[in-house]
Amino acid sequence: GCSKRDLDDFYAALEEADLVVIATPVYHLSFPAPLKALIDRLQRYWSARFILGKRPPISKGKRLVLLTASGSGSPEGGPLLEKQLAPPLTVIHAVLAERVHAVGADSPDFEPAPYLEAARLAAHRMV
């Protein structure tokens, strides 16, 4: 485990959660560093599964909603983050239930309304 026990409250909340929402910008077709660091700190669940053989490492299953925003107009960012999230989702007993990937946010012509509506509809499907 990590030498610092600074995420104990986070781990407890994660283990009890029914739903996890990740809302993040896409930086260079990846996660920003603070989110990547948090994902890396899920190592305790990876170790529980693959070293200790505990399957699933978190007994309570959960659904995950991924909301991304890319500055560029390229649609690649959100789906790449989905692929990067796939392994950590298995060890936290989560399935990607909904996703909304906003693209072109840096454009002066960017219109957020369709993405906000898609996120609203995704939220309604989660309840």
Where are these regions (language model features)?
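Short, basic, helix/turn surface patches
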Residues: G1-L7, K54, A118-V127
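Helix-loop-strand module that forms the ligand-binding subsite of alpha/beta enzymes
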Residues: S3-A86
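Glycine-rich phosphate/pyrophosphate-binding loop and the adjoining helix
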Residues: P75-P79, K83-V127
